[in-house]
């Protein structure tokens, strides 16, 4: 079985016998039901392949669709002129980078269909290209724009440049409305949907498919599709990892499923990660190998965002569906970029509860954030997560605390604002990362932060104080009886009181007490 990893051409996919999860029935429905569409989905979710599939369909390439659902549905297979603008191929850091891209595409189209020498602006030239393409071929035009939002995403944090991009693209896309009589179909795709003064404000007849239940599986794969199309690699993956097929499916679901684009919707798998897993027969973090956009961290830092709120956010459809570039709320960007997804829906109030879609995204995103909030880097051996976990599994609380203290003392404070927020965010990240390897319960409320960490042979109860005392923290563990759930547990128990100095921005004291108490010792 050949897996179309990175294959964005439908023609190449079909001619070279790559596996294809058939989405053509939905493509046919879109073509029959309407004319203008918009779709946002996370990166690496198959948007470009979808655009290529639609291009092949409207080019009348019946030969490429043999055996697929649309082969039985479509009778005419008309060939339409296609205007395909792919904005994903460039890096946009100046106005010229965008105008050069539009100029190149317009020149190509004008050579094919004709040019009006009087037309000067991009928008006017585009209008004439649409009209001339119709007049020359006798068929209405199909317009496909892939990653329409990439210029604006790369300009997040630069409001002036973003406004320039918006002004250019707003007029350019507005040509679709003025030339409606010459157009058969139009689809614009991207990662995000920008609101307020949108590039689509002149094109108000777009149907947004992003939260349309009928097309929630237009990109990505459902569990049924995974089982139907990939039985062979699932069996091979099970054998390679010494798992049953049921265990393999459960692990795939935990790792790569979990995207929900509508309320009470079905779970959608990330296709890129899934195909890489089948190709390599190894569970990995493939989505993050292709890079995490730095603008996400910039948004979180800009607002001094409280990271624990990532999995506690409640939002409305209006917020999820639209990004305001001057807003300090990063939630809509994180949702549309695929780092958060819908976990629950309150129909009475129209509210969505958000969270990480799956283990791959949660682990990868938190690992990506670690260097920005702590001194923990993968390349810094003393602070590697493996050594943290090694200390915990081997019953070395003193070494563990030394590493924790060193972690906070080695942080780049230039990016840190509020000291308490800094500690809360760093505390959250370290606890969550340890939670992928050990059982960790974290509590943060009323100025109190604590951890309960469980390994096979050891239990650690850790109480933190901010500008307090390690002795008081340890005393609170004993007085509140935080160790009571483990009194009958055969594992070794350690109680640890820790103080974090907000002024020094470091852990300045801790106290460790084995239980049952056989003597306590201090670190000052």
Located regions from the model:
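Domain-level recognition of nuclease-like catalytic cores that cleave nucleotide substrates
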Residues: 485, 491-524
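Conserved catalytic cores of phosphodiester-cleaving nucleases, focusing on short active-site segments
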Residues: 427, 451-466, 480
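Phosphate-binding site recognition
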Residues: 1-419, 434
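Active-site metal-binding core of divalent-cation-utilizing nuclease and nuclease-like domains
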Residues: 132-137, 430-456
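Metal-dependent nuclease catalytic cores in nucleic-acid-processing enzymes
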Residues: 172-179, 332-340, 428-432, 476-496
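Mg2+/Mn2+-dependent nuclease catalytic core
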Residues: 162-167, 466-483
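Structural motif
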Residues: 142, 458-460, 494
